[in-house]
Amino acid sequence: MIPVVIEQTSRGERSYDIYSRLLKDRIIMLTGPVEDNMANSVIAQLLFLDAQDNTKDIYLYVNTPGGSVSAGLAIVDTMNFIKADVQTIVMGMAASMGTVIASSGTKGKRFMLPNAEYMIHQPMGGTGGGTQQTDMAIAAEHLLKTRHRLEKILAQNAGKTIKQIHKDAERDYWMSAEETLAYGFIDEIMENNELK
């Protein structure tokens, strides 16, 4: 069930679902697994807010375990495509593809709440049962290319070398807010709506 907010206006009462009300304040919620439907909704909101006023920041709140690489990269590409700055605020966690999205916010405007976590790792893939050897080789090559592309984005976002990202992402690499700040994925830690 999605909560409803009722506001008093000069014309009377107006009710909004909570996400529409947040959108009115240029806030987008990116929560749950990254998949095509969620990505399409986030992309549509980014495009709408940019078309409405590209001189005002967009606030993207992130709490996701990650998910689809293609859906996540569609969000990242849109964030980079639009003119409005995108502030990212991580609450809960930004893991896997969520880290790529959250760290792709406008430099200087990437934030994290004090008890949130970041996690990077190499992309996962599979071929399913009954796959021919040739198809398995194609899938493996694609997975390696995808890993390199994600490592390049993460390296740019954190100011690290691709080699360092490759090493750290070999296995699940969890970071606290302080560790994420030191690593370079965020610019500041937010506490009580103020920067730390």
From Swiss-Prot:
Its EC number is 3.4.21.92. The active site is at S96, H121. Gene3D superfamilies: 2-enoyl-CoA Hydratase, Chain A, domain 1 (3.90.226.10). InterPro entries: ClpP (IPR001907), ClpP/crotonase-like_dom_sf (IPR029045), ClpP/TepA (IPR023562), ClpP_His_AS (IPR033135), ClpP_Ser_AS (IPR018215). GO terms for cellular component: cytoplasm; endopeptidase Clp complex. Keywords: Cytoplasm, Hydrolase, Protease, Serine protease. It is found in: Cytoplasm. It comes from the Bacteria. CDD domains: S14_ClpP_2. One of its GO terms (biological process) is protein quality control for misfolded or incompletely synthesized proteins. One of its GO terms (molecular function) is ATP-dependent peptidase activity. SUPFAM superfamilies: ClpP/crotonase. It catalyses: Hydrolysis of proteins to small peptides in the presence of ATP and magnesium. alpha-casein is the usual test substrate. In the absence of ATP, only oligopeptides shorter than five residues are hydrolyzed (such as succinyl-Leu-Tyr-|-NHMec, and Leu-Tyr-Leu-|-Tyr-Trp, in which cleavage of the -Tyr-|-Leu- and -Tyr-|-Trp bonds also occurs). PANTHER family: ATP-DEPENDENT CLP PROTEASE PROTEOLYTIC SUBUNIT. This is ATP-dependent Clp protease proteolytic subunit. The gene is clpP.
